[in-house]
Swiss-Prot record:
Domain of life (superkingdom): Eukaryota
Role summary: Substrate recognition and binding subunit of the essential mitochondrial processing protease (MPP), which cleaves the mitochondrial sequence off newly imported precursors proteins.
Annotated segments matching region Disordered: 73-94
Pfam families xrefs: Peptidase_M16, Peptidase_M16_C
UniProt protein name: Mitochondrial-processing peptidase subunit alpha-1
Species annotation: Dictyostelium discoideum
Designated gene of the protein: mppA1
Localization terms from the record: Mitochondrion matrix
Subunit structure of this chain's protein: Heterodimer of alpha and beta subunits, forming the mitochondrial processing protease (MPP) in which subunit alpha is involved in substrate recognition and binding and subunit beta is the catalytic subunit.
Keywords per UniProt: Coiled coil, Mitochondrion, Transit peptide
Entry's Gene Ontology molecular function annotations: endopeptidase activity; metal ion binding; metalloendopeptidase activity
Gene3D superfamilies: Metalloenzyme, LuxS/M16 peptidase-like
Family: Belongs to the peptidase M16 family.
């Protein structure tokens, strides 16, 4: 005789013992008849199986009781009177009897809800999902398709199974193309996206996008400007018509231009009033490439923004927004449809202009320099505020001179505009003085240091796999911060995280990075520590960087390759990233490498490849930037680094 214990389901918690006869019991559709004063029927509630088939296929008779023992000559059970959540029952074979179950029930409570194992009546006939693995595996695998229009516009698209498509307009233009006279023009062109055109007002454009768009954004960088949207497939043509209108019929009204210039200036002040990663990156690019090309800052100075006019915007638009510089990328649509629509709305754009520079001509002027730059945190912003204060004071003096030279106004004249301007100037001067005082009282508690080395550009992907090796090395070094939510897949077992971040609570952040550009990239390590610990943190970083070549293992390499592949594949699951990825490939080297091809290249990376890359990077002239909390904070310069490497080259790179 078998004794089995069952946890009482919540639906039975209010049931008392009574007589229940369960007739026609089977595993598929049990029918339960409740005999009590308030008789109720329960059908198809298969909370548990009440039948056990033994080897003789005999039917069982089951007797259930609560808080009582069922004794037989062959078994015994001690009930627990305090345990109200268990049922005990015994089973015995009887070839002559059918299944019978008896209980004593005083009152019954039946759930009004449909059981979870039964399809809701309103969903009957609806196919919610498919478990047919074979059907899922037989779905057509879509590949990226590339075409070029007669005017040079390149179109890349990839069909998907989604009902949403991502659309991106990418222009081969950015701050690397700017001259000293038009610094900030491409940043302002980005800010003027979705603004008034000859055909629509700004409010109309925004309203239309709000009604159809899931996501809309514009961004600019050193080598590219892009506008991207996510919409339902049915709205693809409408979005392309909006994008076409933006680059063929803008008005760039003076009022909107002034507004966006103020936005850019506020962004500049926000970035320079910190020791943020973006500020470090901007300074680093200037150290690495000088004051032109890739060395041009993505954010211009307030004075440079103030010099931008409508004419400069139109000139940049005419010169760079040409067919050979444009790539249109779409996911979630048929390629033939995309080609037809792009030709309809963009087919009249000229291939080029006489004064349009080629990317090769710009890249030929880019040379890596290297060196060192250091400053005290907040000093850049403080200097900007002081120069702004001086400018306002000079403007105030000129205004007073103008007022003295003016003739007296009649008593019944309107309020003099100069009086209002003077009041605004006085207010702005006082606010600037307060900002300078607050900045001087501000105590910075962290110092940052960054070192970077020249690396192969994206245009070399067809020739070698240096970029792929750099991605794997980045994952191998990894990094992290002193505060982390944890969890797998975050590189917590990487070198920099284990041996630098975890070495001291005074290390706030340390990570490896790879800034990829067309001709030349930058590979490096960034470090942030508490004030007074920067020198110790730099020693930890150099120890990991210079000793990595001789100490890394095959296991670390395989983990880094898996991590890099998972990051790439996970990011490409987002339609916007996939759209962006295809366009960047076309802009950089004219073709598209699928995720499968990239993963195969990552798998082919060997220990020797990484060792050669480390030797090449470590022995090149670095670019070093430090933003320290105070002037007495010791730092490491590029010259000092080169001296350390030279003295230890025989042991480090043998």
């Amino acid at each position: 005789m078998n004794i089995i214990f069952l946890k009482v389901p919540s639906i039975f918690k209010k049931l008392n013992v009574g007589n229940i006869k369960i007739l026609n019991v089977n595993q598929n559709s049990p029918s339960i008849i409740v005999n009590s004063n308030n008789t109720k029927s329960i059908k198809n509630h298969n909370y548990s199986s009440f039948t056990n088939n033994n080897n003789n296929n005999n039917k069982n008779q089951v007797n259930l009781v609560q808080n009582k023992s069922i004794l037989s000559s062959s078994s015994s059970y001690k009930g627990n009177n305090n345990n109200n959540n268990k049922l005990s029952y015994t089973t015995s074979s009887n070839n002559n009897n059918n299944n019978k179950i008896e209980e004593i029930v005083k009152s019954t409570t039946v759930s009004p809800f449909t059981p979870l194992n039964i399809l809701h009546p309103k969903l009957v006939g609806e196919k919610l999902y498919s478990n047919d693995n074979e059907a899922n595996n037989n779905q057509k695998e879509f590949k990226a398709e590339i075409s070029t229009l007669p005017n040079g516009i390149r179109v890349v698209s990839k069909q998907t199974h989604e009902g949403v498509c991502a659309i991106g307009l990418y222009i081969n233009a950015g701050t690397k193309y700017e001259s000293p006279q038009d610094r900030g023009v491409f940043n302002l062109l980005e800010k003027m996206t979705f603004k008034e055109t000859k055909n629509n007002s700004t409010s109309e454009i925004i309203k239309e996008l709000e009604e159809i768009s899931m996501n809309a954004m514009a961004s600019s960088s050193r080598e590219m400007i892009n506008v991207s949207l996510e919409v339902l497939r049915k709205d693809l043509e409408f979005v392309l018509s909006i994008l076409s209108d933006q680059i063929k019929s803008p008005t760039y009204s003076e009022e909107e231009l002034r507004e966006q210039i103020e936005v850019c200036i506020r962004n500049y002040e926000m970035i320079t009033n910190s020791s943020s990663d973006q500020l470090m990156t901007e300074i680093l690019m200037g150290v690495a490439f000088g004051d032109a090309g890739l060395g041009n800052l993505v954010i211009a100075t307030p004075e440079q923004y103030q010099n931008i006019t409508r004419e400069k915007l139109f000139d940049a638009l005419r010169k760079y927004y040409v067919g050979k510089n444009i790539v249109i990328s779409v996911t979630g649509a048929e390629h033939s449809q995309v080609i037809e629509l792009v030709d309809k709305y963009f087919g009249d754009i000229p291939f080029t202009q006489k004064d349009t520079p080629s990317e090769d001509s710009i890249d030929s002027t880019i040379t890596y320099k290297g060196g060192t730059d250091a400053c005290v945190a907040g000093l850049i912003h403080k200097n900007h505020l002081k120069s702004q204060l001086q400018f306002l004071i000079e403007k105030q003096q000129k205004l007073k001179q103008q007022q003295q030279q003016q003739q007296p106004q009649p008593q019944n004249s309107n309020i003099d505009d100069n009086d209002n301007e003077e009041e605004l100037l006085n207010l702005e001067i006082e606010q600037t003085k307060i900002s300078i005082e607050q900045l001087e009282l501000q105590q910075v508690k962290e110092s940052s240091w960054i070192i970077a080395f020249p690396h192969s550009g994206l245009s070399t992907v067809a020739e070698n796999k240096d970029i792929i090796n750099g991605l794997v090395l980045q994952s191998l070094l990894g990094g992290g911060s002193s505060y982390s939510t944890g969890g797998p897949g975050k590189g917590m077992q990487s070198r920099l995280n284990l041996n630098v971040v975890y070495s001291s609570h005074r290390v706030k952040n340390c990570h490896a990075f790879l800034f990829v550009f067309n001709k030349v990239s930058l590979f490096g390590i960034s470090l942030t520590t508490q004030s007074g610990f920067l020198q110790d943190g730099i020693e930890l970083v150099l120890q990991e960087l210079l000793m990595l070549r001789s100490s890394m293992t095959q296991q670390e390499l395989e983990r880094a390759k898996r991590s890099q592949k998972s990051q790439i594949l996970q990011n490409l699951e987002m339609r916007s990233v996939q759209c962006d990825d295809m366009a960047r490939h076309i802009l950089s080297f004219g073709s598209y490498k699928s995720p499968e091809q990239i993963c195969k290249l990552i798998d082919s990376v060997t220990l020797d490849d990484i060792k050669k890359l480390i030797s090449k990077l470590a022995q090149s002239n670095p670019s070093v930037v430090s933003i320290v909390a105070n002037e007495n904070e010791p730092i490491l310069t590029a010259e000092q680094y080169n001296q350390i490497v030279k003295q230890n080259s025989s042991t480090l790179f043998k």
